[in-house]
Amino acid sequence: MTSIEIPDNVTSLGEYAFFCCSGLKSVTIGNGITSIGEKTFYGCVELTTITIPDGIISIGYSAFEDCNLTSITIPVSVTNIEGRAFWGYRNLKSITYEGTIAEWEKIVRGDNWNNSKLVVHCTDGDINIE
């Protein structure tokens, strides 16, 4: 499987749903999703970019661990990013956040949610994460 489109009538992506789907390159997440579960995309090494739609509230533990993400867009609806969500490959250099710096600072982020230096691009400026 190289691509997947999750329809709008699906409300959550369960734990391990696409675990180690090494050939998965493209994911379109429907607007009905409110959470991405633990290790949902863990080990999807061909997945390089993803846009998380508005309405997602939580990104689970290790949800994108060991993916080869280079960029990700996170909506202002996200209030929780659990530990190791973007852990693994160090190619993730930027996050586009669709809210302000103050809104980004309010997001609950678990320990080791990310392991690389990156820039979070907010609507009112950038944040450098070491």
Regions found by a protein language model. Name each.
Residues 1-12, 22-35, 45-58, 67-80, ...:
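Structural signature of tandem-repeat unit edges
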Residues 87, 107-112:
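A structural signal for leucine-rich repeat
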